[in-house]
Regions:
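Catalytic cores of the polymerase beta-like nucleotidyltransferase superfamily
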Residues: 1-3, 7, 11-13, 22, ...
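DNA major-groove recognition helices of helix-turn-helix
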Residues: 47
Length: 527
C-alpha cells in the first residue's frame, strides 16, 4: 500500500502513484453533497482507468489527487454480502471511504451505524473501519484529531463533523474484564469484525461493496435477536460491560437475547463488579430511557442487579399486602417505569422512589403491610445509590427531591398547591405530578379514579397559579433584603425570618405581594 510519506513540506505535490492531478480546494470543499463528491472523485484518465481522489498536503490553494485502477479488485470475501442492501451514508462518510479506497485501502462504515441504518433508525454517530493504519489515515486528510492512536483511532474532521476512523485490529488477552492487554493491527476485516460484541454490531458497509455480514447479523436483525459473536463466555470475559449492553440493546431495539447468550450472562454476571461505576451508569440510563424499561426485571432474573443494584433485589423480595398494591415493591417499580415518559430524571425517580420500603415495612395484626416514612428513607437510599454510580449533582438534587415528595398528597386547593410548589420547587413540581400519576397507575385499581382526580385537580390549579404569575418562592417575593435594610432592619438571621414570614403570608394571600402591602404587613405583624 502506498501513502504520502509523513513529514514532507506542506503543499508539495507528491506522486505516490503513476498519475498525480492537482485541483483547486474549491472542488473539494468539505461541505459538498455525496453526489458532488462522487463526481469530483471519479475523473476520466488515460487507458480507461478510473481516477480517484485522495487528500495529501494542503497549502491552502491545492491538494494532490492520485489516480489508480479499480481499488481492491478481486479481493476475496467470506460470509454473506447483501448486494440488495443500500444504505444512505452522510457525505462525510462517503468522502472518507472514497479517499481511503482511492489510495489502496479498504474502508467501511461499521458497527452500530450500520445496524441502525438497516433498521431505519438515525445513527447517533458514524464509525469507519479501515486497513490503513492511523498514521496513513492522518497523511490522507488535512484535519484530524489523535483520538486514540494506540487503539488505532483517528477522528477525521470534515463538513463540521467528526468521524472516528479505526484501523482493523485484533484485541489481545483481557486480564481485568475491561481492557485488552495489547492491541494488534491487522489487514483482515474478518478478524476486526470477529472481536466485536454482538452479531448485529459486526456488520460493515461500503457504497461500492454493499453489506458485509460475516456472522449472521442480518439474520439476527430480522429475527430480533441479540447474539454474541462467537463464544458468548469469551466475549463477556473480554469486557463484562457487554453483559449490560446485551440487555440494553434488547431494551432499545425490542429484541430478545439468544438462549446461549443469556446463559453466559447468568454465569458471568458477578464479573460486573470489575466495571467502573461511570460505565455502569451510562448503560443503566440508556436502558431506563428506552422504550422497554421493564427490562430491569430481566436484569434481576439474570442476576445483574444483584451486582450493580442490590437494593432492587430487596424490593423484588418485599411484598405489599395492602389493597393499594397488586405485587411486590419491585414489580410495582417496574410497572411505574412504564407509566412515565422517557426522561432520565423521571425514570430514575420511578426506579428509586420506593427503595426505602423494604426497611420501612411493618405488618399489623391483620396481616396488612404499612410503609410509614418510606419517602424519606427512599430519599436517603436514592442519594446513596446515585452517588455510588457517580451521577452529577444536578441529577442527584432533582431525583432525590422528587423521591422525597413522591407520596405527598397535595389537596386540589389554591393555598395548598402554592405551599406545595414552594416546598418542592417550581421547576420540579410539574415533574412531581408526573411521578405521582405514574405511581398511581402502577398500583391496584383500589381508589385509583379518586387518586387520579386529585392529581388532575392539582395540575389544573398549578396551571392557573402559573398563568396568574402568583408568588410561590422567595425569588418572586415583592420585598427583598435591601428593602428591609432601608427600613432599618439589620442584616442577619432576623432578616431571613422576616422574609419567610412575608412569604408565608403571600402563599396564603397572593394579593399581598406588592412592596407597599408587604412593608405595611411587616410594620403591623413583625415589629
Amino acid at each position: 500500500m502506498r501513502v504520502c510519506p509523513a513529514g514532507l513540506p506542506r503543499g508539495r505535490r507528491i506522486s505516490c502513484h503513476r498519475k498525480t492531478i492537482s485541483y483547486d480546494m474549491k472542488t473539494l470543499r468539505e461541505d459538498r453533497t455525496a453526489a458532488e463528491w462522487k463526481m469530483s472523485l471519479t475523473r476520466p484518465a488515460a487507458g480507461g482507468e478510473s481516477c480517484k481522489a485522495g487528500f495529501f498536503h494542503d497549502n491552502g490553494k491545492s491538494v494532490s489527487i492520485v489516480s489508480e485502477k479499480s481499488v481492491c479488485a478481486g479481493r476475496r470475501r467470506q460470509g454473506i454480502r447483501s448486494e440488495r442492501v443500500r444504505l444512505k451514508l452522510p457525505a462525510g462518510v462517503i468522502m472518507i471511504i472514497d479517499v481511503l479506497e482511492a489510495n489502496g485501502y479498504e474502508a467501511y462504515a461499521v458497527g452500530g451505524c450500520v445496524r441502525d441504518s438497516i433498521l431505519g433508525r438515525t445513527p447517533d454517530d458514524w464509525d469507519i473501519t479501515t486497513s490503513a493504519d492511523p498514521w496513513q489515515v492522518k497523511a490522507l486528510f488535512p484535519r484530524t484529531v489523535d483520538t486514540g492512536l494506540k487503539h488505532g483511532t483517528v477522528t477525521v474532521l470534515t463538513g463540521g463533523n467528526g468521524y472516528e476512523v479505526t484501523t482493523y485490529r485484533i484485541d489481545g488477552e483481557y486480564e481485568d474484564g475491561r481492557h485488552p492487554k495489547q492491541v494488534e493491527f491487522t489487514s483482515s476485516l474478518t478478524e476486526d469484525l470477529m472481536r466485536r460484541d454482538f452479531t448485529i454490531n459486526a456488520m460493515a458497509y461500503s457504497p461500492r461493496e454493499g453489506l458485509i455480514d460475516r456472522f449472521g447479523g442480518m439474520q439476527d436483525l430480522q429475527r430480533h435477536v441479540i447474539r454474541c459473536v462467537g463464544d458468548p463466555r469469551k466475549r463477556f470475559g473480554e469486557d463484562a460491560l457487554r453483559i449490560l449492553r446485551a440487555v440494553r440493546f434488547g431494551a432499545q431495539l425490542g429484541f430478545a437475547i439468544a438462549p446461549e447468550t443469556e446463559e453466559a450472562i447468568r454465569e458471568l454476571a458477578p464479573t460486573l463488579k470489575k466495571i467502573s461505576a461511570e460505565r455502569i451508569q451510562t448503560e443503566l440510563v440508556k436502558l431506563l430511557v428506552s422504550d422497554r424499561p421493564e427490562m430491569m426485571a430481566l436484569m434481576w432474573q439474570l442476576g445483574i442487579t444483584k451486582v450493580i443494584l442490590p437494593e432492587f433485589d430487596r424490593m423484588m423480595d418485599t411484598p405489599q399486602n395492602t389493597p393499594h398494591h397488586r405485587g411486590s415493591v419491585g414489580e410495582h417499580t417496574v410497572w411505574a417505569l412504564e407509566q412515565v415518559e422517557r426522561d432520565k430524571v423521571l425514570r430514575l425517580t420511578m426506579l428509586l422512589h420506593d427503595m426505602g420500603k423494604p426497611q420501612a415495612r411493618t405488618t399489623d395484626e391483620t396481616g396488612r403491610d404499612h410503609f410509614k416514612g418510606h419517602g424519606e428513607i427512599s430519599r436517603m437510599t436514592a442519594e446513596k445509590i446515585l452517588r455510588r454510580l457517580k451521577f452529577d449533582n444536578d441529577t442527584i438534587r432533582k431525583v432525590t427531591r422528587l423521591v422525597q415528595w413522591h407520596d405527598y398528597r397535595v389537596q386540589p386547593e389554591p393555598r395548598a398547591v402554592r405551599r406545595a410548589v414552594c416546598q418542592v420547587g417550581e421547576d420540579l413540581f410539574p415533574m412531581l405530578l408526573k411521578v405521582q400519576r405514574a405511581d398511581t397507575l402502577a398500583q391496584s385499581e383500589y381508589r385509583r379514579a379518586e387518586k387520579l382526580a386529585r392529581i388532575d385537580g392539582v395540575e389544573r390549579i398549578f396551571r392557573e397559579i402559573s398563568e396568574k404569575g402568583q408568588c410561590v418562592s422567595m425569588k418572586t417575593l415583592a420585598v427583598t433584603g435591601k428593602d428591609l435594610i432601608a427600613c432599618g432592619v439589620q442584616p442577619g438571621p432576623r432578616m431571613g425570618e422576616i422574609l419567610q414570614i412575608l412569604l408565608e403570608a403571600v402563599l396564603d394571600d397572593p394579593s399581598l405581594n406588592t412592596r407597599q402591602r408587604l412593608l405595611e404587613y411587616w410594620q403591623e405583624k413583625c415589629r
